[in-house]
């Protein structure tokens, strides 16, 4: 991979190196990657309050059905994405899909402006937003794993991830600012603008990292290659199982928290304050760890340690929940779990993908990030509903039920780390 020579001035480069171990020729591409993820998640976190408000207005029963629809839509979209990835040059896949989603936002804006109370429009937007989030983030990391090498990823993915966290913090602030002068539906246009800006940053990243070169051919292969490789390749099967278990356990904590909040905090404004305070704590801690800690953990302690941080945190959380099923316990566990997921486990998995082939980076990663991810959500929802409703398990018993899953998750993390080491060694020898 080559880089062009136009880079920031020495003084700005020296300032940046205080936070990240970046080489002189990588600075522009790194900053563009940061900005790309920043604008992408800012766009989503502007859309999310609109989606959540629609969810509340549609009601609890409709939400359960909509999440099932989201999972089905994910399954349908996988072969369509496989077709696009197989037939079109990789340099066009991401910008084309991002622009398509931006046009969708404009379309929803027009529809909601015309008939904002239409249940079908509202339900469709809720499903769309849930799909949009996973697809655009998955495509972003596919691009990153294509353009950054394995060694570069260990040094730089923490900083790039911090761009997304900064976007997650900025999006709600932009919403609070714009909502004073715009109607809620007009926020969709702001989101569309930021998504388009993310495309522009993506072009800069690719140009700087590939030098405008030839790493842009279509991935080729069949439309279901991603799904097939997940079930036939041990490395990808373990990544999928890791993500699946992470979502089962994470959704379990989420649903238990929702139950405790409903029974403990009865004022709507107080609930909003509780959730916003939790999210703010997660975002600030995650940002600081991504800037100052993620790269150090990946380089000095390895991918396995970063992967283990998440299931070990969850294991401690389930034990605490077994002894004291209080709201503050669940909230503290969720904060710790999300911090370890965003700042350590997720970057570690993205590092593993840098060792994959171009075909795998797009098709396999997208299948796991969408279908497997939402499959974990759906499974956890049904499992939690069965245990708490049909079988009448108490909250303390629920923690004990989740513990075996978490222990399996720890084992999967260790095996996944070992698989990564083997593939990294093979790649090093081949080089």
Show which residues each predicted segment covers.
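Intracellular loop-helix junctions on the cytosolic face of multi-pass helical membrane proteins
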Residues: 1-34, 60, 87-91, 102, ...
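Substrate-agnostic recognition of the 12-TM MFS/MFS-like secondary transporter fold
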Residues: 28-81, 121-179, 218-229, 238-294, ...
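Residue-level recognition of pore/gate-forming positions within transmembrane alpha-helices
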Residues: 71-74, 98-105, 192-196, 247, ...
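Conserved MFS/SLC helix-loop-helix module at the cytosolic interface between two early adjacent transmembrane helices
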Residues: 78-97
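Membrane-embedded alpha-helical segments of multi-pass transporters/permeases
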Residues: 79, 106-110, 169, 196-204, ...
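A membrane-interface helix-boundary motif in multi-pass transporters
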Residues: 89-93, 176-193, 277, 301-306, ...
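C-terminal ends and interior cores of transmembrane alpha-helices
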Residues: 99-118, 312-326
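C-terminal transmembrane helical hairpin of 12-TM major facilitator-type secondary transporters
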Residues: 305-344
């Amino acid at each position: 991979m080559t880089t062009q020579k136009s880079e920031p001035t020495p003084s700005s480069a020296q300032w940046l190196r205080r936070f990240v171990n970046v080489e002189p020729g990588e600075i522009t591409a790194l900053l563009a990657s940061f900005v790309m993820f920043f604008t992408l998640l800012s766009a989503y976190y502007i859309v999310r309050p609109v989606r959540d408000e629609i969810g509340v207005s549609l009601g609890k029963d409709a939400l359960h059905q909509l999440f099932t629809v989201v999972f089905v839509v994910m399954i349908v979209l996988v072969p369509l994405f496989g077709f696009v990835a197989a037939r079109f040059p990789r340099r066009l896949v991401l910008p084309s899909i991002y622009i398509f989603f931006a046009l969708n936002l404009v379309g929803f804006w027009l529809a909601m402006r015309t008939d904002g109370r239409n249940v079908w429009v509202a339900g469709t937007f809720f499903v769309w937003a849930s799909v949009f989030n996973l697809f655009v983030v998955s495509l972003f990391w596919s691009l990153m794993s294509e353009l950054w090498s394995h060694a570069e990823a260990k040094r730089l993915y923490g900083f790039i991830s911090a761009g997304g966290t900064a976007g997650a913090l900025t999006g709600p602030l932009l919403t609070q600012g714009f909502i004073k002068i715009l109607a809620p539906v007009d926020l969709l246009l702001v989101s569309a603008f930021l998504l388009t800006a993310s495309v522009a940053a993506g072009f800069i990243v690719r140009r700087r990292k590939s030098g405008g070169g030839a790493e842009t051919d279509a991935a080729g292969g069949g439309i279901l290659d991603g799904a097939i490789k997940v079930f036939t390749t041990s490395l990808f099967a373990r990544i999928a199982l890791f993500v699946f278990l992470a979502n089962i356990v994470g959704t379990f904590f989420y649903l238990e928290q929702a139950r405790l909040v409903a029974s403990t905090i009865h004022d709507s404004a107080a609930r909003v304050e509780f959730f916003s305070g939790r999210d703010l704590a997660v975002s600030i801690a995650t940002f600081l760890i991504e800037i100052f800690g993620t790269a150090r953990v990946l380089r000095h302690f390895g991918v396995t340690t970063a992967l283990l941080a998440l299931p070990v945190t969850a294991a401690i959380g389930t034990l605490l929940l077994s002894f004291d099923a209080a709201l503050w316990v669940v909230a503290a566990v969720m904060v710790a779990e999300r911090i370890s997921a965003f700042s350590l486990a997720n970057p570690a998995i993205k590092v593993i993908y840098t060792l994959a082939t171009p075909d795998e980076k797009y098709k396999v990663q997208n299948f796991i990030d969408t279908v497997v991810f939402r499959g974990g959500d759906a499974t956890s929802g049904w499992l939690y509903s069965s245990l708490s409703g049909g079988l009448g398990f108490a909250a303390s018993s629920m923690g004990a039920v989740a513990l075996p899953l978490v222990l399996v998750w720890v084992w999967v993390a260790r095996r996944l780390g070992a698989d990564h080491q083997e593939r990294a060694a093979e790649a090093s020898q081949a080089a």
